[in-house]
Regions:
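Flexible coil/turn and secondary-structure edge motifs
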Residues: 1-182
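A short, hydrophobic C-terminal helix/tail in secreted or cell-surface proteins
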Residues: 183-187
Length: 187
């Protein structure tokens, strides 16, 4: 299988019957309970390469209430890290960003996203190659979707003026929840 082509449903790994991590559980670095409710918050899911580094970007973004890493956009139920790494699940490494829209705008969150990875690389980021490293945005509200589309268009114009190619970032509505990953790739 080509690492830069999405797996078909016929060739996707079968996956597991139960989630890799069951709730409740806590963020390994911050200690936050990951099923903690945040009234008046919004959540957006961002894929921009390796999720460990991407998640750290949002820890220091004002108005971000919580982050978590896992997988979205795939075919295989309850995949493990090793399964996702094969490219045979269809999932992307993803950061869940929960934020207070009264403190930080969706546009500001998306600016951090776009300015901290190369959204023109397709199924890779730098030396990390594979569908799991693709650039994607999964929105949870129609307003987020419209904002993401507008921000992507503006950013695309700037990239073209600077001599870069087309943005390959996929934007869609989240049609499922984040599949949490184990705290370590060895798990």
């Amino acid at each position: 299988m080509n690492k830069t082509e999405m797996v078909s449903s016929e060739n996707a790994l079968p996956g597991g019957h139960t989630p890799v991590l069951a709730m409740p559980f806590f963020h390994r670095v911050t200690g936050d309970r990951l099923d903690r409710p945040f009234p008046s918050s919004e959540t957006i899911y961002l894929a921009m390469g390796c999720f460990w580094g991407a998640e750290k970007l949002f820890w220091n973004t004002g108005g971000v209430l919580q982050t978590a890493v896992g997988y979205m956009g795939g075919l295989t139920p309850n995949p493990t890290y090793r399964e996702v790494y094969t490219g045979c699940t269809g999932h992307a490494e993803t950061v869940r960003v929960t934020y207070d829209p009264n403190q930080v705008s969706t546009e500001a969150i998306l600016t951090v996203f776009l300015e901290n990875h190369d959204p023109t690389q397709g199924m890779r980021q730098s030396n990390d190659v594979g569908t799991q490293y693709r650039s994607a945005i999964w929105c949870t509200t129609t307003e987020q979707f419209m904002t993401a589309t507008t921000v992507k268009g503006s950013y695309q114009a700037n990239l073209l003026n600077a001599g870069y190619g087309a943005i390959t970032t996929a934007i869609s509505m989240a049609n499922g929840c984040l599949l949490y990953t184990s705290p370590s790739p060895r798990d």
